[in-house]
A protein has these predicted regions:
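Short alpha-helical transmembrane segments in multi-pass integral membrane proteins
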Residues: 1-21, 75-142, 188-247, 303-368, ...
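Short runs within selected transmembrane alpha-helices of multi-pass transporters and secretion channels
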Residues: 68, 72, 137-156, 163-171, ...
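Transmembrane helical elements of multi-pass membrane transporters/channels
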Residues: 16-35, 136, 170, 203-207, ...
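Small-residue-rich hydrophobic transmembrane alpha-helices
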Residues: 47-107, 144-163, 275-341, 372-396
Length: 450
């Protein structure tokens, strides 16, 4: 069935949820890019130092990302089933879990920051700055975990405009305090990389407050006043539901980060300039991912609702609409990256050697973005239906094996250096696209109960 055969109401409903979700994800990625741009004023070493913290940070967040996928899928399904009280029981259990887990994880990562960053391949020029940045970011991770968790529940309920506003304000706070604290403006101290970390934490503090406020309304599908009024308590059955959907996502996240860490180590081994160019490339690729991520969140909400309402064909239709929209966006982005790659890198670095490396990276990213957005949507559709074991297997094959092996082959065997590492990313994205699309089209995911 072609896109134009869908009725206007299905397309309108998809776009009404998709545009805030895409805008939210885009501005989060854009804030990361601006963060790198402002940090680049300190030198290539600072960009590389921040880049070294990315993978260990996400390993620390793996448990919470898995829980977020669970709560989003479960809330969407319960909304489709019309079971508001059960959804809030799951939400109450989820909140207690992430708060306790975030405190424990934060203490652990701050304590072990030095050996963790050394394990990530830091050099003398980047180690101390990376450790400082990592400690501050992970010290404030509880605020990040709270806002991510509540926003995931809101997305599952289809409230993407609420999460968009939360993240827009958070990212604005981050950028403003980056300006004030990195180099020191309007009487604020020039704190360098420490200022960048503090600005990020301040942004998450604001967003966590806004997120909590968003569920403090009785008419929301997930609502703290409702939980208190009806004396809904966390329970083991709800926790078991969260684990059932999320355990394979957690395994997937860990295996993903093993693959990402391996390629990050290879990039770090290419030297500070190559690592700096690589980090900016990752941030730029994050911009394209943001569109897929927004459409993925849309697919989770609509597919979960449709399956909960016992309408699997409508669920598949929504997934196809999201993928078509994503495909159109990816073609536009690929063209922009091909034409504007040198200009983008010129904003970050004065050193022509780094800009030249970046132009090569951007040519590869132009290919990656076409594969990436579609695979993210397909995989999001499967996760939203609860087919998380399959997505974990696909991620293991694609990222942990294909990406790592491909990066090693092109980087060292073919001697392509940092560009070879990005060819490994192409192999990863292509593998996930093929395996995700085949599973989606077969339709087995429509029969999964969660």
């Amino acid at each position: 069935m072609k896109f134009f055969d869908y009725n206007k109401e299905d397309i309108r409903k998809t776009l009404s949820i998709a545009w805030p979700a895409m805008l939210e994800s885009f501005f989060a990625a854009f804030a990361g890019l601006v963060d790198s741009l402002m940090v680049s004023s300190l030198g290539a070493y600072a960009v590389a130092a921040v880049g070294l913290t990315t993978q260990p940070k996400f390993i620390g967040l793996a448990l919470f990302i898995a829980a977020n996928v669970s709560i989003s899928a479960l809330v969407a399904r319960r909304k489709g089933e019309g079971k508001r009280e059960e959804a809030n029981k799951i939400f109450a259990t989820f909140l207690v879990f992430i708060i306790v887990a975030a405190i424990g994880m934060s203490i652990l990562l701050v304590t072990l920051a030095d050996p963790i960053i050394r394990l990530c391949g830091s050099e003398e020029a980047t180690h101390d700055s990376a450790v400082l940045y990592f400690r501050i970011i992970m010290g404030g991770m509880i605020f990040n975990c709270i806002q991510m968790g509540i926003n995931s529940a809101q997305r599952g309920a289809g409230n993407t405009k609420i999460t968009m506003r939360t993240n827009l304000v958070s990212n604005t706070v981050n950028i403003v305090f980056n300006y004030l604290l990195i180099e020191g403006h309007f009487g604020f101290p020039a704190l360098g990389i420490k200022g960048a970390a503090l600005a990020t934490v301040l942004g998450t503090v604001v967003s966590s407050i806004m997120s909590v406020a968003s569920v403090w309304k009785k008419d929301n599908f997930v609502s703290i006043p409702l939980i208190l009024e009806q004396k809904i308590k966390p329970c083991f059955d709800a926790f078991r539901n969260i684990i059932k959907v999320g355990y394979s996502v957690f395994a997937e996240q860990i295996l993903l980060r093993v693959g990402f860490m391996a390629t990050s180590l290879m990039a770090a081994a290419q030297g500070t300039q190559a690592m700096a160019a690589h980090q900016v490339g990752m941030n730029i690729m994050g911009l394209s991912f943001s569109f897929g991520d927004g459409l993925q969140a849309t697919a989770v909400a609509l597919i979960g609702y449709s399956l909960g309402a016992n309408n699997p064909e409508l669920a598949k239709k929504y997934g196809s609409i999201c993928r078509f929209i994503g495909g159109c966006i990816s073609v536009v982005l690929a063209g922009l990256y091909l034409v504007g790659g040198g200009w983008l890198y010129g904003m970050f670095f004065e050193e022509q050697a780094i800009v030249d490396i970046g132009i090569g990276i951007m040519r590869v990213i132009a290919l990656i973005v076409v594969l990436q957005i579609s695979q993210v949507i397909y995989m999001g559709c499967l996760r939203g239906a609860g087919d998380t074991l399959y997505t974990a297997i696909v991620s293991t094959i694609s990222v942990t094996i294909m990406r790592t092996a491909g990066s090693f082959f092109f980087c060292y065997v073919m001697n392509w250096g940092i560009i070879g590492i990005w060819m490994g990313v192409v192999a990863d994205q292509l593998s996930r696209l093929i395996l995700g699309s085949v599973r989606f089209k077969k339709g087995k995911w429509m029969k999964i109960k969660i």
